[in-house]
Amino acid sequence: MIAIIDYGMGNIRSIEQALTSIGVEHLVTDRQREIVKSDGVILPGVGAFPKAMEALEAKKLVTVLQECGKTGKPLLGICLGMQLLFEKSEEMKSSNGLGLLPGVVRKLQVPYKIPHMGWNRLTKTKEMPIWNRVADGSFVYYVHSYYAECPNDMICGTSEYGISVPGLVAKGNIFGAQFHPEKSGEIGIQMLANFKGVVKQWKSSQLSI
């Protein structure tokens, strides 16, 4: 069972539809107990970083998400949800994030239209499970004005938009997609199926303990 975190700022319906299309058992929840019992977590997000953190804090979800990350449970952040995984953001004001990944979220300073919206090529920079059966250079769908500045060894895929934008990041059991896999057609669906595989493998490892 994958828990989709409902804190009032996520593109939940599209993610639900994508997971349903590939037979992934899931639930939308803001309950700590259900999140703890889940086998994997998806943290969506659309909007501003400070308001998102305030919403998570109001629902008392910050600690449970941090614990999920630290215990090895697979966690996938999407768009703003990916940004929330990092230590800090400069959006609107300096705000602390979940601190599960090292790095700072900064505003795109590029000679192009902001937000970065539409299809862009994702170039593989490092192998990770979510790349399975996905061709290097596949096109994915973005909508964002901020990006994660983070260590190179975490970056698994980038897109060019005036700068090299980290599109896919990973560290241990924590994964982040700056783009929207649920809006990225068959490529995005395959990536979500790959995350399902990561969750299944982790669940099996827990049963064998």
Curated annotation (Swiss-Prot):
Its main location: cytoplasm. Its EC number is 4.3.2.10, 3.5.1.2. It catalyses: 5-[(5-phospho-1-deoxy-D-ribulos-1-ylimino)methylamino]-1-(5-phospho-beta-D-ribosyl)imidazole-4-carboxamide + L-glutamine = D-erythro-1-(imidazol-4-yl)glycerol 3-phosphate + 5-amino-1-(5-phospho-beta-D-ribosyl)imidazole-4-carboxamide + L-glutamate + H(+); L-glutamine + H2O = L-glutamate + NH4(+). Pathway: Amino-acid biosynthesis; L-histidine biosynthesis; L-histidine from 5-phospho-alpha-D-ribose 1-diphosphate: step 5/9. It is found in: Cytoplasm. GO terms for cellular component: cytoplasm. One of its GO terms (molecular function) is imidazoleglycerol-phosphate synthase activity. Heterodimer of HisH and HisF. NCBIfam families: IMP_synth_hisH. PANTHER family: IMIDAZOLE GLYCEROL PHOSPHATE SYNTHASE SUBUNIT HISH. This is Imidazole glycerol phosphate synthase subunit HisH. The lineage of its organism: Bacteria, Bacillati, Bacillota, Bacilli, Bacillales. The gene is hisH.
